[in-house]
From Swiss-Prot:
The chain crosses the membrane at residues 9-29, 59-79, 95-115, 125-145, 154-174, 177-197, 222-242, 260-280, 292-312, 332-352, 371-391. The gene is nhaA2. It catalyses: Na(+)(in) + 2 H(+)(out) = Na(+)(out) + 2 H(+)(in). InterPro entries: Na/H_antiporter_dom_sf, NhaA. This is Na(+)/H(+) antiporter NhaA 2. The keyword GTP-binding does not apply. GO terms for biological process: regulation of pH. It comes from Magnetococcus marinus (strain ATCC BAA-1437 / JCM 17883 / MC-1). One of its GO terms (molecular function) is sodium:proton antiporter activity. Coiled coil: none annotated. It is found in: Cell inner membrane.
């Protein structure tokens, strides 16, 4: 591979840029003569058979239920590593990001709920503006290069990881349909097997993957969202290798998945889910409760919630402002937390999966949700970048 291309792909901003380009491509195709081909592509039936078990889903659901399980596997690996040997292993490093994450979840959810309180069906989308897209937010921050203090980047990363953990819990508790006891028993047996393998010191990743596939199928059939199987699998992958100094299975798998997810799965997910039809679009549609609640939740709720809760915790003596960055820079990061994008799109697919892509006034469907997500995320990204660009130290001449 050309050295310049390799360097570009290893740039932290690469994933965010690809996700953005994929979303732009989806919107361009959806609003062109190729839109029927785009939707037909996402509706392609894909069947996989295991003995007598057949799983048949359109391609879109394979992306959302299957490939996104790989994304959540990576999230599970990162969470385990951070809690056991990373920044989250030190309680003093956790307080401020946790407080910020709580504010960044509570206020957006409250804003959305307040705006949509007259529509019970729309209330299912309350969690959509609570999410933060790690790859996109860090990608925007990476555009500012070495001007960004390490402590500021670490704060955003830690807050986003905690935000992901909250998203996992929200999906598990609030977006689970009717449960299948038989499938849950199989899933429980698979989890027990994975834990036993970990306890016995099994370090071969392939064995965990085989049992993980069984777990994914069981969770898929259980009524719990299948992506949670990825999180569970990530939690049981061993953190230590067989020999001292050897690359552990967790670190190896995390390294292997990092670029697959950031440069492949997330851009593909964005392309499959960001197609918004602009036909008949007028500014008034943004004032409909669903897109308005999501857009304001992401843009206003996130920045005020994150910054406000952090400010209160510091002023009350609960935490300290980390060395190396200022209040203005902290506010810029709070703005970047409003870039919900892929995570918000994912949660909206759970909340409004019954809806069409048509933008119907007041209807709780994917179309109106996507519009709100794109608006809130773009505004948060632009204003966050501008504020950080002017508040960070000037690069050396």
């Amino acid at each position: 591979m050309n050295a310049k291309i390799r360097k570009m792909l290893h740039n932290p901003a690469a994933s965010g840029i690809l996700i953005f380009l994929a979303a732009v491509a989806a919107m361009a195709v959806e609003n062109s003569a190729w839109n029927t081909h785009y939707n037909a592509f996402l509706d392609i039936p894909v069947s996989v058979q295991f003995a007598d078990l057949t799983i048949a889903k359109p391609l879109l659901l394979w992306i959302n239920d299957g490939l996104m399980a790989v994304f959540f596997l990576l999230v599970g690996l990162e969470l385990k590593r951070e809690f056991l040997e990373g920044e989250l292993s030190q309680p003093s490093n956790v307080i401020l990001p946790v407080v910020g994450a709580v504010g960044g979840i509570a206020l957006p959810a409250a804003i959305y709920t307040l705006i949509n309180q007259g529509n019970p069906a729309a209330l299912d989308g309350w969690a959509i503006p609570t999410a933060t897209d790690i790859a996109f937010a860090l990608g925007i921050l990476a555009l500012l290069g070495k001007r960004v203090p390490a402590s500021l980047k670490l704060f955003l990363l830690t807050l986003a990881i905690i935000d992901d953990l909250a998203a996992i819990l929200i999906i598990a508790f609030f977006y689970t349909s009717e449960l299948s006891p038989a499938s849950l028993m199989i899933a429980g047996s698979a989890i027990g097997t994975l834990i036993l393998m970990n306890r016995l010191g099994v370090t071969g990743i392939s064995g965990y993957m085989v049992v993980g596939i069984v777990l994914w199928i069981a969770v898929l059939k259980s009524g719990v969202h299948a992506t949670l199987a990825g999180v569970v699998l990530g939690f049981v992958i061993p953190l230590k290798g067989e020999e001292p100094g050897e690359l552990s299975p967790l670190h190896q798998l995390e390294d292997d998945l990092h670029h697959v997810v950031g440069l492949g799965i997330l851009p593909l997910f964005a392309f499959a889910n960001a197609g918004v039809s602009l036909q008949g679009l007028t500014p008034s549609i943004l004032l409909d409760p669903v897109p308005l609640g999501i857009a304001l939740g992401l843009f206003l709720g996130k920045q005020i919630g994150v910054f406000g809760f952090v400010w209160l915790s510091i002023k009350s003596g609960l935490a300290k402002l980390p060395e190396g960055f200022t209040w203005k820079q902290l506010y810029g990061v709070a703005l970047l937390c409003g870039v919900g994008f892929t995570m918000s799109l994912f949660i909206s697919s759970l909340a409004f999966e019954h809806g069409s892509s048509a933008l119907v006034s007041g209807a709780p469907d994917m179309g109106s949700a996507r519009l709100g997500i794109l608006t809130g995320s773009i505004l948060s990204g632009i204003f966050g970048y501008i504020l950080l660009r002017f508040s960070l130290p000037k690069p050396p001449q």
